[in-house]
Amino acid sequence: MAYERRSRPSGPRKKFFHRRKYCKFCSDSTIKIDYKRPDILHDYITERGKIMPRRITGSCSKHQRELTQAIKRARSIALLPFVVTEGR
């Protein structure tokens, strides 16, 4: 019993335009990464409480490391939650 393979249409594919992500902290030097500012750090955490990766946030590697350290410090002194509790 062999299965029949379905071929894809051989027409032209749509080309997607990927917008270049930029580091918000490199472009605007007035924004500082600080563990005491959870309003800024909250933008880099998912709704589940996980730290967003660099490929999604668009920040450079230097600032991503600083963000990670600041988020972990803010979690340890209870400015940010480790895990977000689900509403019942």
From Swiss-Prot:
One of its GO terms (biological process) is translation. GO terms for cellular component: cytosolic small ribosomal subunit. Keywords: Ribonucleoprotein, Ribosomal protein, RNA-binding, rRNA-binding. Pfam families: Ribosomal_S18. GO terms for molecular function: small ribosomal subunit rRNA binding; structural constituent of ribosome. Coiled coil: none annotated. The keyword Ribosomal protein applies. SUPFAM superfamilies: Ribosomal protein S18. InterPro entries: Ribosomal_bS18, Ribosomal_bS18_CS, Ribosomal_bS18_sf. Binds as a heterodimer with protein bS6 to the central domain of the 16S rRNA, where it helps stabilize the platform of the 30S subunit. Part of the 30S ribosomal subunit. Forms a tight heterodimer with protein bS6. Belongs to the bacterial ribosomal protein bS18 family. This is Small ribosomal subunit protein bS18. It comes from Syntrophus aciditrophicus (strain SB). The gene is rpsR.
